[in-house]
């Protein structure tokens, strides 16, 4: 009985070992590919628990979601002979589930070492060998990751369809310490130069602003002066027009006064012409003689009151009296003008 119990226990232990070796679990986002006697089977299994023949069949889990492969400490020689090292390069890739069996058959389950790691080393060395340290470290560093991604994807499209590269991230390479210090000094000088240039631009901008401000002020002063000049010109023109109007009015008044005086004199002369009859002239003669207070001596004094029409022609006497009357009239007419002058 003891022997039977030992056999049963041994068989139970063997069955437990066989079950433990045959049952396996596949995580989500992975596929299991199986090898039987070293040959790859064409039927992979998805996530979950699965059973296989122990000791005869083996499996490998292959990730089919996004994964990041890291390549560290990649050496690279520039065209100038300087050896630099890229500390870390990250490649984000994804394998399509339908292409898992073909890629594993052609490149094993560690396909990333063949298709990604080796290709990164090759492409990076190709890039460095045709560029200087200045270009690799500074000028062209921003395009290295894109160039690597493009070159990788181009080769994978031919060699392993179904494996896609999503992104490539490259860290700054390590360069010799002496060269690094020189670059740091150079960058510091560039920074100082940039600050100087920017300061100069600011000063030039301020000077340009001041110049424009001065031009604007000068233009404003010129415009104000022009407006004031135009205002003065208009004032002078207005004064000139007012003076012309006043002169015209004065001339019109003087002309009207002269016309009135001329008309008055003409009418007075016409009235005198009508008034100077022989009888009136005779009366004026006697009045003038009577009003004369001067004393005359001579033999002809009595004859002054005698009608001398017989001895003198009537025409001559009439002319003398008319001239005398005209002189008296002119004296009377000149008296108002003299008073106006005062």
Curated annotation (Swiss-Prot):
Q: Which GO terms describe its cellular component?
A: endoplasmic reticulum membrane
Record keyword Ribosomal protein present: no
Query: What domain of life is recorded for the organism?
Result: Eukaryota
Give the Cytoplasmic compartment stretches of this protein: 1-6
Q: Where in the cell is it found?
A: Endoplasmic reticulum membrane
The GO annotation for biological process reads:
cholesterol metabolic process; SREBP signaling pathway
Could you tell me which residues belong to the region Disordered?
A: 308-342
Question: Could you tell me which Gene3D superfamilies the record lists for this protein?
Answer: Band 7 domain
Pfam families linked to this entry: Band_7
Membrane topology, as annotated, equals: Single-pass type II membrane protein
Main localization category: endoplasmic reticulum
Task: Please give the family membership noted in the entry.
Answer: Belongs to the band 7/mec-2 family.
Tell me the function of this protein. Answer: Mediates the endoplasmic reticulum-associated degradation (ERAD) of inositol 1,4,5-trisphosphate receptors (IP3Rs). Involved in regulation of cellular cholesterol homeostasis by regulation the SREBP signaling pathway. Binds cholesterol and may promote ER retention of the SCAP-SREBF complex.
Under which name does UniProt file this protein? Answer: Erlin-1
Q: Which organism is it from?
A: Danio rerio (Zebrafish)
By which gene is this protein encoded?
erlin1
